[in-house]
Amino acid sequence: KGFALFSCLGKEVIIGILSVATLSNAQAKGISTDVQKADTSLYKSGQPMLLDEVKVTGSRAPLTQSQQSRMVTVLSRKDVNAAPVHSVNDLLKLVSGVDVRQRGPLGAQTDVSIRGGNYEQMTVLLNGINIGDPQTGHNAFDFPVDISEIERIEILEGPAASVYGTSSLLGAINIVTKANRTSSVTLHAASGSFGSVTSGGRINVARGKWNNQLSGSFMRTDGYNRNKAGALNTDFRSQKAFYQGFYDDDDLSISWHAGLSNKDFGSSTNYSSKYDDQFEHTFKTYTAVQAETRKGAVKWRPAIYWNHNYDRFELFRDHAERYPFNYHRTDVYGVNVNAYFDWTLGRTAFGAELRNEDLVSTNLGNPLSKPKHVKGTDNVIYKMG
């Protein structure tokens, strides 16, 4: 209608819109709760102040947080110390985008998910080593370290299957332990209501290029609830021990660790509301050795690890005659090699991983050709796997 004049004149009007957008550089900055404040006294004196960025785990090559091309949240040691929490599970509740569903007190058992997924769709790492359990993700957060031993926590949002495998569909969480370079001894203890007691300690010995540290912790509580018969059904007991060592020079750095987590807890109605006297025992061990070269055109980062898990679930606590206990044992062995090099167009990384997951169980998997005896029992066997 508005173009009737042009129509009378025998003219044709063509109207078009050309939209042009140029993306020269897009980068998802890592969201960090680690806020560093400049020391104004140094600024006024004219002295330069350098703040080293933390290298986070998000690719096969080490990158600082600002170089990451995906969403990364870093909880620093300062954040961990300032948070009014007693477990890693409670600490993760403070991070947006992370869903924490906890069963029992003091982090007895927790399901953690990222970006609306579930606990089976993310990878859990300890010092960059995948400690995922093929049996279940329910016990993924049975760490061998106490919260007081954590240096920082890195939460990587988004698929990371190319680095950590298919389990990291929606992201990964990496727990990095402290690596003090000076000799020291620390102890801590606390108590609370419902018979709650926590204690722990760490000893660190540093000699030149070598560093060794050993830590342990104990935690227990009577729980806050009882079953219909009046017995405790949310009680909890946990023992943890962790050793790690380092060798560091200009050409090479090597780190190794070994840890265990022993946990017993009344799981109440965790798996079925029909039975209120469930119980679970888990025992996990972790070992790993890593290295990184620092000279040469190509930097290499090999690692080898072994994770062992034993799990016993009791539908009726201490009464196997009412319903047989479920036993599971997993052994995960792995070796990986990552490498990277810098050149004109930036940094290129490549790597490979070989991982073997072995599961034997009384009720999970396929029938075994040769059943295996369950250690510590009289006549129970693993018949599936």
Question: Where does each model-flagged region fall?
Answer:
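N-terminal periplasmic "start-of-domain" segments of outer-membrane beta-barrel proteins
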Residues: 50-81, 111
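Extracytoplasmic beta-strand/coil segments of soluble accessory domains associated
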Residues: 89, 93-129, 133, 151
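Non-catalytic regulatory/gating segments with a bias toward low-complexity or hydrophobic composition
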Residues: 92, 153-154, 173-175, 245
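Short acidic/polar hinge/loop motifs at secondary-structure boundaries
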Residues: 130-157
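Short strand-turn segments of transmembrane beta-barrel domains in outer membranes
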Residues: 172, 177-205, 216, 231-234
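Transmembrane beta-strands of outer-membrane beta-barrel pores
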Residues: 191-193, 207-209, 218-222, 249-251, ...
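Flexible loop and strand-edge segments within Gram-negative outer membrane beta-barrel domains
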Residues: 221-238, 252-300, 306-331, 376
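Outer-membrane beta-barrel transmembrane domain signature of Gram-negative proteins
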Residues: 306, 323-385
